[in-house]
Structure formats: structure tokens, C-alpha cells
Amino acid sequence: MKPWHRALYGHWYPVARADQIGSRPQAVSLLDTHIALARTASGGWIALEDRCPHRHAPLSAGCVSADRLACPYHGWSFDAEGVLRQVPGLPEEGALPNVRVRAFAACQFDGLVWLRPGDAGADQPNALVRATDPATRRFQWHTCWPANVVDAMENFLDPMHTHFIHAGLVRRDARRVPATAHFQSTREGFTVDYAGGPSQSGLLYRLFESRRTAERAHFAAPGSTRLEYVYANGSRVLIDLHFTPRTVEATDVFVSLHVEGRWAPTWAVRLLVWPFLKRVNAQDVDMLRRQAENKRRFGQRRGASTELDIVTGALERFWTSGELAQGVQRRELQLML
């Protein structure tokens, strides 16, 4: 039995950076669905199940000619709809077998290739993704975390671990300040506004930021998350992480950094900011790996939670039931951040 709720297949997920997909097919996976992805000669996308129906060779090892994907074993070629168009060696008068490969809807937003693993569902990715201006993007990166998608997303959206896992870089446990978190559900997920903390106690804030007027966390189903920082000078920084589960224990993470209203050329971000962000990522990956190993060691047990775990319930609900909360939900809590 598949571990994923059927409703999850109707959503869109990023599977690759668009600048890294050309005419040479690549194998990608989401929700335990294996797909061959390539760019066609006309600039479109071809996304087919990574299995030729002839002798089950991987289509991702094949090649693209014009707008068709050819199998590496016997050359059977299929169009973007998965229809068989050619069998090399078959006489012209010979009839093509009535077979096809499962095809997947694909599109591009904010420099990423998005796929919908289900035959039906949403027409396009969520509004958070569609509203993002690619012209403000300063950095993009793809990695894979050794974690369940809920654990991975909670890690990014949860500020309470930063005093320990990222001690000194993001926050310091000895320099907590009172803050208020306002949780509100939305049509696509939820937002959490943090008030009372115009600055952070870590090195990253001191080096690269100025006084904040707003700090907000976003979740838009299925796997889009954002940390939004608004500054007193009118500028804004968006750190977007889009999560795509390959399997129950491995999650692709697509990172985009957007900067609005302040000087931040791409070269400066890569040279000055990226080394620190890479360190933060390594710290998170190390803890997520330890967490996953310990879950396997002790078996799946439900974790104890407090009101500080403000995002966990909504994430678990969506990924287990495929549903968001009904109606508008609001709650507020006090915390030492």
C-alpha cells in the first residue's frame, strides 16, 4: 500500500531547477513515483513514467529527439502525451502497438520545474509560488534532506530549535526576548506572524540585516514554505523552501532567496551569505538524520508537544489526510524567542 494519501497527487511539486534540465533526460521522483524529465526541442517539457512499456528499460537513460523521448534499449519513442510514435525497424506498413507511457503535467515557475503526479487536480502551483517575482531572485539551490516531509518542513518553520542547533549563527539561548506568535489559517495553508522581536541575537542578523518591522512564516500546500522579513527601510527578504517528498524518508528541498528594495547582487549573496546558509543547512541535516535514525531505532511513536509547536498539527493533518483546516483558525501564544 502506498504511504501517501490520494489527495496529495492532485498538487504540484518542484522536481528540478529549470536551468539544470536540458535535452538529456533526468530521473526524478516524488511521492514514490518515478519520472523521466527532459526539455524538448521546442522548449517545452516532457515528463513520462520512467519505464518503457516494451522491456521496462528506464526512459531517463534515453534521449530526446525533437519533441519525443526515445528509449535507450530499442529506440521506441514517445511524445509528451506518452503516445508511442515510432518503433525503429518496423516496416512502414506495420501497425504500431497500442501502448503508451503515463505522462505527467509539467510547468515552470520561479526557476523551477513543477510536476503534478496525479491525472487530475490543481491546474497550476499554489498562489504563493505564482505571485513570486523571479526578477528579485538572488540565489537558488537544490538539496535532499534525509527526513520525512513533515519533520523537514517543521524544522524550517520552527524557530524554537534555532537557539540550539544554530547557536550563535541564528539565535542565542541566553539572549531570548518576549515575543507573540499569531497563527492564522489561509485558503492554502497558514501564516504565523511573530511580533516583539525587531532583531535576532545571532551572527547572521548582525552581519546582513537591519531593524525588522515584520517577521512572518508561510505555508502553502502542498510543500511551499517561506520566511518573510520586512525591514524599517522598506526592503523585504523572502527565504523560500519548497519540499518535495521522494519517499517517506527522503525529501527534496528547493531553496530560493528573494531580495526586494535593497542592494544585494547575486555575486555578493553567493560570496558573503551562502557560506553561512550552507552551514545552517548542514546543522539542520545532521539533526534531521539523527532524528530519522532514532525513529527507526525506537519505532514510530507520537511525540509529545506543547503550545510552542505551533505549526506541527497543521502540517501533520495535511500530509496524513490531504486536507487543510476547515474555516478560519486563529490563535495567539506568548513565547521567549
Which sequence ranges carry the predicted segments?
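Rieske [2Fe-2S] iron-sulfur-binding domain
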Residues: 4-9, 14-137, 189, 257, ...
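C-terminal catalytic domain of Rieske-type non-heme iron oxygenases
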Residues: 44, 123-337
